[in-house]
Amino acid sequence: GLALSILIALAAICFALFSGEPYYVQVIIWVFTNAVLAVTLRFVLLIGELNIATAAFFGIGAYATAVASTIYDLPFFISLLAAPIIAGLISALFGWVTLRTKGPYFLLISFAFTEVVRLFYTKSEFLGGNSGMIGMFPPMALNDYFPAIAITILTAILLILYLTERSNLGRVFKAIQNNEDIPRSVGLNVIAL
């Protein structure tokens, strides 16, 4: 089961990285990037709510980096800092507004927010419209290290989320998933968590 899946994934990664084919390396980087998105969505599911807006926050971070790099001509590494800052602020605002809703209402709000963000990207000329933003290139010196950087980021996120899930906070998330009234009855502010 799981061990075989991990072994096959590691074999595919090694093949892609050592083949020397840029296409395979790019595919592996995209797989790791989407794995980060999948892992964060799974983490959000710990509280028992499906938050489709996770994809919107992912896109907001990507576009924040691209805008900082291409429009404002900030250095690449400074531009990378824009992603967590902008996406984090917008997600905190989104959570503050929507976390009082539950079930299908929360799902519909998160879906609507994601659609609004998508429409904003595709209809904004300064963001490239349907074609997206063009002209954001990382430093050439990093090209050979991108797979290692992607693996490191994914591993760090997996470790952080694994430890969080097994911490007291993770247990509180599971309690909220099972019955939100129980954590409230012992004085926990469910909305703040």
Describe each PLM feature range.
Residues 1-193:
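Transmembrane alpha-helices and adjacent helix-loop boundaries
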